[in-house]
Regions:
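...with weaker cross-activation on analogous glycine-rich loops/strands in unrelated enzymes
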Residues: 227-309
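Low-complexity, Gly/Ser/Thr/Pro-rich intrinsically disordered linker/tail segments
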Residues: 309-392
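OB-fold/S1-family single-stranded nucleic acid-binding modules
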Residues: 97-113
Length: 392
């Protein structure tokens, strides 16, 4: 049982008595958010999210409140502005009116992480080199969360993926975990929704804690193209991600794809974005033996064989002796040693990473005229040269 959920279960025993006595129905409080009441229960799901109760701890008391759902759009969907600020175990100043939270603001920690990534980009610099440097910034400190980077209601970009820079929330969550972290269940044959980070209920309770594959790509694009926080985001479904970039006029999309093998003449260029069914990844280029170095967020197994993982440099190849794996291993071990102590480099199966069905998956290649410029000539370089330039 994760510690967040344990605290909720223990403290929730006092909620019924507090509600029955009519205590704390209106007022202002400094309170720690504990989570949605009855998290993981069958009825605590997206269909009922407008009626959730939310648990807060204030001065050792656990209080349960309704919450304002915000305003509705033309289709009748709320925007949930308060829910999209809530993060478990964080301190807030909340305003309560007749048992409903109507306003809140986070009270910043005095000892927030001062993590500085080995490589990072410059917001708004629309070059291929900057895209790849930006994509490296969350590597090694951002765990895989299914729905991470999507908003609470699972409709678009979260606050974190519409904000410049690596989110301190990702770093904090990473630092609170170890190699036994699992994005879903320690034993997938025995699902445990009440104690899982996986969004069984169809909404994203842990949207803020890490990134899934499309959340990661959305953050990378936002931090490449935007220069201020809070603009429209780029997060969207992984299978059609590459195709949507082509629709923006930023480059070429194709389904004429096969796995490189070093002899068939097919290569993935640095910066190419590949969508397969349920996953999306960024190419760092194709090695001489046909293996490919990539960047992505994936729940790869830890050294204790738990499905955790996250944003990392990986390799697509046939074995751990392939050129791409050796490169990925070199850079992950040297520049991200804490991550490397938890997670070996992930070797991806070429058949899985180049096979797809349907009309939406495919490969996207940037146009240097209408998408990203490439003054460094990265599209024509080998992965070894690309990585050396990025980490220079």
């Amino acid at each position: 049982m994760n510690t967040m959920k344990l605290s909720v279960l223990l403290s929730a025993l006092s909620v019924i008595a507090l509600l029955a006595s009519g205590c704390a129905r209106s007022g202002e409080y400094d309170a720690v958010y504990l989570g949605v009441k009855n998290y993981g229960a069958d009825k605590t799901n997206a269909d009922n999210k407008d009626k959730f109760n939310y648990l807060f701890d204030t001065d050792g008391r656990t209080l349960a409140f309704k919450m304002s759902n915000g305003t509705k759009d033309e289709e009748g969907n709320y925007d949930y502005p308060l829910q999209n600020q809530l993060k478990e175990e964080y301190l807030y100043h909340i305003t309560v009116e007749n048992g409903t939270v109507t306003a809140l603001r986070e009270i910043a920690e005095a000892s927030a992480s001062n993590y500085s990534p080995p490589v990072s980009g410059i917001p708004g610099e629309t070059t291929l080199k900057n895209l790849l440097k930006t994509a490296l910034a969350p590597v090694g400190t951002t765990l895989y969360i299914y729905g991470g980077g999507w908003d609470w209601q699972d409709a678009g970009s979260a606050v974190q993926t519409r904000t410049l820079g690596v989110s301190p929330d990702w770093v904090k969550f990473y630092e609170a975990q170890d190699e036994n972290y699992t994005y879903k269940d320690a034993d997938e044959a025995k699902p445990d929704p009440a104690n899982s980070y996986y969004p069984y209920g169809g909404y994203n309770e842990y949207y803020y804690a890490g990134l899934d594959c499309s959340g990661y790509l959305g953050w990378v694009l936002y931090n490449t193209f935007e220069t201020e926080n809070g603009n429209d985001g780029y997060v969207g479904g992984s299978t059609g991600f590459a195709k949507r970039l082509s629709a923006k006029g930023w480059g070429e999309w194709t389904q004429d794809i096969k796995a490189p093998d070093g002899a068939n003449g097919y290569t993935m260029k640095p910066g190419d974005i590949m969508s397969i069914n349920g996953h999306v990844w960024i190419s760092l280029g194709t090695c001489e033996d046909g293996s490919v170095v990539i960047l992505h967020s994936t729940p790869s197994p830890s050294r204790s064989d738990q499905p955790g993982g996250g944003v990392q440099i990986s390799a697509i190849g046939l074995d751990r002796d392939c050129d791409a794996y050796l490169l990925a291993d070199r850079y992950m071990s040297e520049y991200y040693p804490d991550w490397y102590a938890r997670y070996p480099v992930h070797l991806c199966d070429p058949e899985k990473y180049f096979t797809f069905e349907g009309e939406n998956a495919g490969r996207f290649t940037w146009s240097t005229d209408t998408g990203l410029t490439d003054p460094d000539g990265l599209q024509d370089r080998m992965p070894e040269d690309v990585l050396a330039l990025l980490f220079r």
